UniProtKB/Swiss-Prot annotation:
Keywords recorded for this protein, A-Z: ATP synthesis, Cell inner membrane, Cell membrane, CF(1), Hydrogen ion transport, Ion transport, Membrane, Transport
Localization annotation: Cell inner membrane
Protein family according to the UniProt entry: Belongs to the ATPase delta chain family.
Leader sequence residues: none
Membrane topology recorded in Swiss-Prot or TrEMBL: Peripheral membrane protein
GO CC annotation terms, alphabetical: plasma membrane; proton-transporting ATP synthase complex
Gene Ontology MF term list: proton-transporting ATP synthase activity, rotational mechanism
InterPro entries from the UniProt entry: ATP_synth_OSCP/delta_N_sf, ATPase_OSCP/dsu
HAMAP family: ATP_synth_delta_bact
Gene source species: Rickettsia prowazekii (strain Madrid E)
Name under which the protein is recorded: ATP synthase subunit delta
Location, primary (coarse class): membrane
Name of one Pfam family that matches: OSCP
Length: 183
């Protein structure tokens, strides 16, 4: 089984378990928080991801941590399963797929907007309203910064890329100029 299928299977299984108790959003918040804790702590990440650390030691440490947290039993069991199967390294990918499943179930499109600098709240709202009007769909926007686009914005959703950047425009002009033949 390839990595993408494995990630998809774990995310779908977690989502379906959350769906049974109608706690999809709560589980999403908890696994996102858990993933942030792991990603932000070098020591925890090193411990969980290291093949040199015995699985039993990882499980024992995890079980002692569970007693001090208020995470849902589904989240605790899920992370325990990842530890037992040596799959903790794909947790961030699982969180990403889980989020997509959650948005799809709520009929919300995920849209990534890339700009050269941080957009003001009014600009973000304007972009969101324009995109929602065009797609006739509710959206959840994620804003990223990329200085290489020089100016403008790039919008990504589903398999669609809308490039309104200066870099994209220059690349289009360059492509057209390559096709021009001088007599």
């Amino acid at each position: 089984m390839n990595k993408d299928n494995l990630i998809q299977n774990y995310a779908v299984a977690l989502f379906n378990n959350a769906l049974l108790d109608n706690i999809q959003v709560k589980i999403c918040e908890e696994i996102t928080l858990l993933n942030s804790i792991i990603e932000d702590s070098f020591e925890i990440k090193k411990f969980l991801f290291s093949p040199l650390v015995n699985k039993i030691d990882k499980i024992n440490v995890f079980n002692s941590l569970v007693k001090t947290t208020n995470f849902n039993k589904i989240v605790n069991n899920f992370l325990l399963l990842l530890i037992k199967n040596s799959r903790t390294h794909i947790l961030s990918n699982i969180v990403e797929v889980y989020n997509k499943l959650l948005y799809e179930s709520r009929n919300i499109k995920i849209v990534h907007v890339i700009s050269t600098n941080e957009l003001q709240p009014k600009e973000q709202e304007w972009i969101q309203s324009r995109i929602e009007k065009e797609l006739q769909h509710k959206t959840e926007l994620f804003f990223d910064i990329d200085n290489t686009i020089i100016g403008g914005i790039v919008i990504k959703y589903d398999n669609v890329l809308r490039d309104y950047s200066i870099k994209g425009s220059l690349e289009k002009i360059a492509k057209c100029l390559k096709n021009v033949k001088i007599c």
